[in-house]
C-alpha cells in the first residue's frame, strides 16, 4: 500500500498560481495603461507584503474597475497566502520528508532514532565517537571550495580524529535537474556581466529571494533532506549564500535545530548578497566589520555574529621561509624584486597583455638589465601557459600552471596583480603583499575594491600599461609606498581566522552535547 505524498495543498496552491500569473501576463496589457489611464504596474507600487502608501490608491483604483484587475488582485492574494505558508511556518511536506512506504530516513517524528547509514543517535551523540561536520558549498567561483577546504584542514590540524569533516556541493549532488546545474549557470552568467548584474541585484529584495526559496523548496526538499541526513552531522557549515534557507527550513521542520549546530561562514569581504543571512543560524562568522553590519541589518542578534576574518588554508599561518630560498626553489632570480600575476584557477583576465607590459616596464634599456621579475600563475589555462612560455622575455619570467602551494608563490614576491576575489585578497594580506586589482565580478566583489583602496593595501587599475608603470615605480622611486602598503596589509590580515572559527564551533557542539546529556539525566 503506497502512502500519499505529504506535500499536499500548499504546493498545489503555488503551482496553481504560476500558470495563473503567466496567463494573466500574456493575456492582459500589464505594461500599458488601463481604462483609467494609470499603469497597472510601476517600479515601486507593488509590494507583496502590502502596497506602498504613496501609490496604493492609484493602483487599487486602476484594478477595481476591470476584470483583469480583479483577477490580478485575486492572484496576488493567493501568492501572499502561499508565501506566508512557506516563509512564516514550516510546510507540511517538511515535517515528514515525503518518503514512500518502502523508504525510511531512520528518524521518527519525535526526533529519536538513528539514521540508517551510520546508526548513530541523533539526540545523544556519544562523546567518544567522532563528531561529524558537513560543509555545504558550491563551485560557483573558486572561493567557496577554498574556504571549505581551509575549514576542513583546520579541523584536522586542531582536533585530529575527534571530527569527521565532509564537503558537499549541495546543489550539484543533492538536487534534481535543473537545480543541479547551478555551477554551470553561474559560470555562464558571470561571463555575461549585464545578465549577472540583473540576477544579483534583482534577487536582493527579501520578498523576491524568500519567495524564490519557498517555490524552489517544493521541488527539492526531499532530495536535499536526504543529502543532509545521510551524513548525520553534528555541525553544518554553509560557505555559500544559497545554502542557508532551504536546509534550515528542513531542519526546523524535522525538529533538529536544537540538535544540530548550523552556522554560516561568509566568504565575501565587504559587499555580500542578502541571502547570506538567516535568523535561525546558531552563528554567522563575518570576515569584516562591514559584513557584520549587514548581518545586523538583516536581523541577526549580536550573540549570533562573530568577526574573525576570512578562513584561509592553515599553511598561510606557518612561518614564512626566506624570499631568496623560495625564489631559488621556484626557479626565480634570488635578488630581483618580483611581482605575482594571477588569473584565478581558470587563468582568466588580461594576463597576457599585462605580462607583456610588465616585461617592457621592468627592463631598463639604458642599463641593459631588468629592474624586476615576473611570476605568472595561469591556473588550468594550458594554452595561455604555453603561449607565455614561448615568449623571448627581456626580464626573468616564470610561468606556472595550476599550483597547490600558492603561499610559497606569494612568499617569493613583493606585490600581486589579481582580480578582486576575497580569498586571494585575504591571503595576500597575510603575506604582506600590496595588491593591484585589475578586475572584479559585479555584486559580490564590487565592495572588495574600496576595501583594498581605503585600507591603504593597494590600487585598482584596469590598463595593463598603467599596472606595469605602477609596479615599475614600486620597484624603483616609489619603494617607500610599496613598504607602507605592505605594512597596512599585515595590519589588516587575520591569519588565525580559520582556527578561531573551528574552536568556536567545537565549543558550540560541546554545549549542545552537554545540554542533551543533562536533559537525558534529568
Curated annotation (Swiss-Prot):
One of its GO terms (molecular function) is 1,2-diacylglycerol 3-beta-galactosyltransferase activity. Changing residue 245 to A: 90% reduction of activity. It is an enzyme of class 2 (transferase). Its EC number is 2.4.1.46. It comes from the Eukaryota. GO terms for biological process: glycolipid biosynthetic process. It catalyses: a 1,2-diacyl-sn-glycerol + UDP-alpha-D-galactose = a 1,2-diacyl-3-O-(beta-D-galactosyl)-sn-glycerol + UDP + H(+). The keyword Kinase does not apply. One of its GO terms (cellular component) is chloroplast inner membrane. The record marks 422 as: Substrate specificity for galactose. Homodimer. Belongs to the glycosyltransferase 28 family. The C-terminal domain (308-483) is involved in UDP-Gal binding while the N-terminal domains (131-307) is involved in dyacylglycerol binding. This is Monogalactosyldiacylglycerol synthase, chloroplastic. It comes from Spinacia oleracea. The gene is MGD A.
Amino acid at each position: 500500500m503506497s502512502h500519499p505524498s505529504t506535500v499536499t495543498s500548499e504546493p498545489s496552491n503555488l503551482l496553481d498560481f504560476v500558470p495563473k500569473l503567466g496567463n494573466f501576463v500574456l493575456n492582459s496589457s500589464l505594461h500599458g495603461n488601463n481604462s483609467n489611464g494609470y499603469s497597472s504596474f510601476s517600479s515601486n507600487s507593488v509590494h507583496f507584503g502590502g502596497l506602498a502608501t504613496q501609490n496604493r490608491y492609484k493602483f487599487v483604483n486602476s484594478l477595481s474597475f476591470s476584470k483583469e484587475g480583479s483577477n490580478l488582485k485575486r492572484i496576488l492574494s493567493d501568492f501572499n497566502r502561499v508565501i506566508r505558508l512557506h516563509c512564516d511556518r514550516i510546510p507540511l511536506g517538511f515535517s515528514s520528508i515525503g518518503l514512500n512506504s518502502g523508504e525510511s530516513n531512520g528518524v521518527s517524528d519525535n526526533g529519536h532514532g538513528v539514521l540508517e547509514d551510520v546508526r548513530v543517535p541523533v539526540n545523544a551523540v556519544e562523546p567518544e565517537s567522532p563528531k561529524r561536520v558537513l560543509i555545504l558549498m558550491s563551485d560557483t567561483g573558486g572561493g567557496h571550495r577554498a574556504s571549505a577546504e581551509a575549514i576542513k584542514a583546520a579541523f584536522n590540524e586542531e582536533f585530529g580524529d575527534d571530527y569527521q569533516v565532509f564537503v558537499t556541493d549541495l546543489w550539484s549532488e543533492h538536487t534534481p535537474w535543473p537545480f543541479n546545474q547551478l555551477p554551470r549557470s553561474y559560470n555562464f552568467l558571470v561571463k555575461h556581466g549585464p545578465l549577472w548584474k540583473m540576477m544579483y541585484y534583482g534577487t536582493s529584495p527579501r520578498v523576491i529571494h524568500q519567495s524564490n526559496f519557498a517555490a524552489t523548496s517544493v521541488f527539492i526538499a526531499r532530495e536535499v533532506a536526504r543529502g543532509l541526513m545521510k551524513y548525520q552531522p553534528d555541525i553544518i557549515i554553509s560557505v555559500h549564500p544559497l545554502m542557508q534557507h532551504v536546509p534550515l527550513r528542513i531542519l526546523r521542520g524535522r525538529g533538529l535545530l536544537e540538535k544540530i549546530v548550523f552556522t554560516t561562514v561568509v566568504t565575501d569581504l565587504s559587499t555580500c548578497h542578502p541571502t547570506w543571512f538567516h535568523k535561525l543560524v546558531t552563528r554567522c562568522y563575518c570576515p569584516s566589520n562591514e559584513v557584520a553590519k549587514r548581518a545586523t541589518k538583516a536581523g541577526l542578534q549580536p550573540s549570533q555574529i562573530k568577526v574573525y576574518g576570512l578562513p584561509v588554508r592553515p599553511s598561510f599561518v606557518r612561518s614564512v621561509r626566506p624570499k631568496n630560498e623560495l625564489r631559488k626553489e621556484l626557479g626565480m632570480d634570488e635578488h630581483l624584486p618580483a611581482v605575482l600575476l594571477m588569473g584565478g584557477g581558470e587563468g582568466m583576465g588580461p594576463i597576457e597583455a599585462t605580462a607583456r607590459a610588465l616585461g617592457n616596464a621592468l627592463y631598463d634599456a639604458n642599463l641593459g638589465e631588468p629592474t624586476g621579475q615576473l611570476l605568472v600563475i595561469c591556473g588550468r589555462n594550458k594554452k595561455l601557459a604555453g603561449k607565455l612560455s614561448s615568449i623571448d622575455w627581456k626580464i626573468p619570467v616564470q610561468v606556472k600552471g595550476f599550483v597547490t602551494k600558492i603561499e610559497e608563490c606569494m612568499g617569493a614576491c613583493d606585490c600581486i596583480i589579481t582580480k578582486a576575489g576575497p580569498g586571494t585578497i585575504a591571503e595576500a594580506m597575510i603575506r604582506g603583499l600590496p595588491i593591484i586589482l585589475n578586475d572584479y565580478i559585479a555584486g559580490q566583489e564590487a565592495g572588495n575594491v574600496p576595501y583594498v583602496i581605503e585600507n591603504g593595501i593597494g590600487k585598482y587599475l584596469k590598463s595593463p600599461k598603467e599596472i606595469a608603470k605602477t609596479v615599475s615605480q614600486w620597484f624603483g622611486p616609489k619603494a617607500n609606498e610599496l613598504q607602507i602598503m605592505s605594512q597596512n596589509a599585515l595590519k589588516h590580515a587575520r591569519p588565525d581566522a580559520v582556527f578561531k572559527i573551528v574552536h568556536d564551533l567545537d565549543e558550540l557542539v560541546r554545549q549542545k552535547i552537554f545540554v542533551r546529556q543533562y536533559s537525558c539525566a534529568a
